[in-house]
């Protein structure tokens, strides 16, 4: 990192979303110096997630434009503001959309990985002081996104929204731990706490669903049923540890429902099911496929604005449980190091999710990759921005 840039604005290339349903504009912006309790990061690698596409689609009620999207990113700290003690210039880091201040009632409860420190301002697309660090060539302010904004050569985040990692961990893989991989893996290990011999079903087998599958396999689940309407996902599901694959459009008997199919396959239902689709009908199916008396269904997928879930109360009265999971229940600053170690020793697959690589200037094509049945993650390299 150059000392010449410390404390000064930096001009760099970013992908700006000016409006919903429009291509991102790859252009030069100005990134202000970090203020107190803020960190400026040179993003080395970033990936495109369905959440970015969801906001760009205009369906996100918290979506604000213009903004710099991106929340799966890793890089190197360029400079820090006053009173930052957790990271320093030169550190290899991952940006965190789920902050961890360690002081709020959420962090001190021991019950959740949610944090209240920056939630209000993060949802408004600004830094904790209510202002933005991004400006376009016309001097117009640009909103932040999920406290990360990794679709920029440089970004500024709150010091509670970044974690230093082992510099030996390759950043192109590490960036995926900023969302999808951690979300699914953590949901299996922390939220559900899958145990040896448990039966598991995963609805939706993208990066999050496959990460649930590998977490369940690591814990020794006896049956892991992957459910997806895209047969191209079958090979990935097997690779990450699924024992069975069901395509609801092809593998059900006449008039049979997916719930009936799963109950038939598991002698009464599953110990754990995971919804990774965001489809509220599938959320209901996932719950009702759980075993009476103890089955738990974990909701990971984010539904569209205004959507509601429903089931017959008897499903819950008879012992089934609905739970939610954000970022896999993982506390980003205190527990990310453990995930990095799992990756380094081979217990957690990460690089296997990188099916596509592109230079940053092809970011709009990377969004198109998401709709390709063969794509799990497209990783963009910052050095190839210009």
From Swiss-Prot:
EC number of this enzyme: 1.1.1.284, 1.1.1.1, 1.1.1.-
One example of a Gene Ontology biological process annotation: amino acid catabolic process to alcohol via Ehrlich pathway
Record: residues binding Zn(2+) 2: 101, 104, 107, 115
One Pfam family recorded for the sequence: ADH_N
GO CC entries: cytoplasm; cytosol; mitochondrion
Enzyme category, top tier: oxidoreductase
Keywords: Acetylation, Cytoplasm, Metal-binding, Mitochondrion, NAD, Oxidoreductase, Zinc
Protein family per UniProt: Belongs to the zinc-containing alcohol dehydrogenase family. Class-III subfamily.
Function field: Oxidizes long-chain alcohols and, in the presence of glutathione, is able to oxidize formaldehyde. Is responsible for yeast resistance to formaldehyde. Also acts as a S-nitroso-glutathione reductase by catalyzing the NADH-dependent reduction of S-nitrosoglutathione, thereby regulating protein S-nitrosylation.
The name this protein goes by in its record: S-(hydroxymethyl)glutathione dehydrogenase
Gene this protein is translated from: SFA1
């Amino acid at each position: 990192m150059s000392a010449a840039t410390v404390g000064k604005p930096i001009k760099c290339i970013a992908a700006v979303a000016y409006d919903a349903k429009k291509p991102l504009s790859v252009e030069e912006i100005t990134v202000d110096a970090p203020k107190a309790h803020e960190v400026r990061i040179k993003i080395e690698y970033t990936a495109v997630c369905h959440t970015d596409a969801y906001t760009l689609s205009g369906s996100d009620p918290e979506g604000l434009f213009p903004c710099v999207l991106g929340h799966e990113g890793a890089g190197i700290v360029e400079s820090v503001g006053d009173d930052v003690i957790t990271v320093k210039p030169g550190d290899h880091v991952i940006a965190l959309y789920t902050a961890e201040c360690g002081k709020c009632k959420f962090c001190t409860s021991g019950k959740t990985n949610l944090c209240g420190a920056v939630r209000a301002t993060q949802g408004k697309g600004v830094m904790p002081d209510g202002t933005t660090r991004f400006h376009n060539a016309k001097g117009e302010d640009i909103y932040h996104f999920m406290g990360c904004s990794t679709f920029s050569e440089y970004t500024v985040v709150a010091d509670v929204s970044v974690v230093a990692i082992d510099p030996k961990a390759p950043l192109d893989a590490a960036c995926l731990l900023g969302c999808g991989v951690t979300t699914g893996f953590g949901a299996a290990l922390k939220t559900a706490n899958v145990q040896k011999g448990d039966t598991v079903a995963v609805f939706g087998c993208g990066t999050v669903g496959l990460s649930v599958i590998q977490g369940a396999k690591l814990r020794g689940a006896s049956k892991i049923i992957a459910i997806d309407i895209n047969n191209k996902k079958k090979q990935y599901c097997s690779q990450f540890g699924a024992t069975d694959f069901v395509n609801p459009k092809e593998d059900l008997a006449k008039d049979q429902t997916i719930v009936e199919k799963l109950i038939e396959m598991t002698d009464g239902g599953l110990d754990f099911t995971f919804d990774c689709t965001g489809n509220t009908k599938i959320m209901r199916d996932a719950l009702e496929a759980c075993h009476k008396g103890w089955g738990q269904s974990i909701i990971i997928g984010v539904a569209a604005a205004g959507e509601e879930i429903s089931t017959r109360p008897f499903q819950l009265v008879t012992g089934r449980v609905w739970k939610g999971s954000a970022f896999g229940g993982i506390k980003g600053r205190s527990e990310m190091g453990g995930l990095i170690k799992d990756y380094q020793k081979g217990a957690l697959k990460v690089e296997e999710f990188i099916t596509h690589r592109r230079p940053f200037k092809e970011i709009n094509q990377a969004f198109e990759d998401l709709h390709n049945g063969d794509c799990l993650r497209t990783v963009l390299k910052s050095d190839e921005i210009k």
